[in-house]
Every structure is written in C-alpha cells, then in structure tokens.
Amino acid sequence: MIKAVVFDLDNTLYSYDANHAYGMEALEGYCRETFGITEEETQEYYRKAGYIMANRIGTDTAAIHSRMLRLQCMMELLEKPLFPHVQKMYHIYWDAFLQHIEPNPGVLDFLMELRKRKIRIGIGTDMTAYIQYKKLEAIGAEVYIDFMVTSEEAGVEKPHYHLFELCVEKAGVRAEECVFIGDNVKKDIEGAWESGLRGIWYTQEKEPTERRYFPTLRSFTEINVDDFLTQQ
C-alpha cells in the first residue's frame, strides 16, 4: 500500500522547458538593449557560462543550477560590470519565468485527491531551495506539499541515493511504501528504484519512445487515484 508520493518538480508538475523559453526571451531583450548583442549571442554566452560553472564547481551540486552564478559568469565573459547587471538579469529571467508558469494538466486535482486520502506528499528536486518554493506557490501546489528535499539540502544531485533517503525519512514511511514520480529516467526513476522506492516515469503527455521495465504515466488526467494507490 502506498503511503507517500514524492514528485520531481521541473518538467513533472509543470513545463520547465516552456517557461525557461520565456525567461530567456526576457533575458535576450535586456542584453540586446543594454549590451547591443543579438539573441543568438546571448544564448551562446549563456551556454559558455554553463561550461565555466561546470568546470569550476562540478555538476553534482545544486549550485550548478544557480542563475545568479550563471549570469555572473556571463558578465565575466562579456567583460561587463557585475553591478547592477547580474541582479537585474536574475530578476528579469525569473520574473518572466514565473509570470507564465502553470501546473501540468491534472496535477492539482491529483494532489488534492492524494491529500483527501491522507497520503504524504513531497518534492524531491535538483535545484536551490528558494526558487523551487516560488515555483510551487506560482502553480498553486504549495497547499498540498508536506515536505521538500532539494539537492541544495541533500548536498548531492539525483540519482544519488542520499537525496532519496531524505525523501523517505521525511515521508515517515518505508521506502517500499513510497512512490517517486519524475520525467528523467536516469535521475528520477532508476535513482528511485535503486534506492528502494517505486519509480514511475512521467512521459510528459507523450507515448514512451522505448521499452522500459518500470511503470509509466503519460498524463496526470488519466489517473484513477484509488487504483494508483493499491496497484503500485
């Protein structure tokens, strides 16, 4: 019997890809007006900044997702002053991102039904904590969340077992009583199963492109909650 359901956040409860595009569009506008560079040049500097970050801090850390650090690296590449641009660009990106964010179809109804059945609901996510809280508030999911585990708190990124251990610890149940739903096969699903949780691959409204030996979920609108809780 399932007693807790833990969700990845980005590209699971909402579309990260769509909202990142809005954030980048706003960032490109600022760079065009302020530095006189094209959208393509902004994107290239943004990519190069990501490579620099990976070399400096590694990839198994929440800091790799920090937009503040990414934009700081961009200013270093452009040889522009850090102040006031880094903070301005940070807020421009995230304001545009959050302005357009919406939950994926069926997500809030599913969370509500889990809450009615007294199922513990958590988030297990690779990212810094503050912005993940903002995203959950923006999609209206915050009222359903019992616990959070970010890679910033865990000190490691998925699929490291420690992040999943923290999810189970905070859920207050056994690992086998805990489902983990996410969009990334390696990080979310294989990581969950290898840590003793039941991983379910959310395929983002698409049919799986390859055969997998674990459960899949195409859409949150298709879930019969009682069957879901007893059949997993």
Predicted regions and their residues:
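N-terminal helical cap/lid subdomain that shapes the substrate entry/recognition surface
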Residues: I2-P105
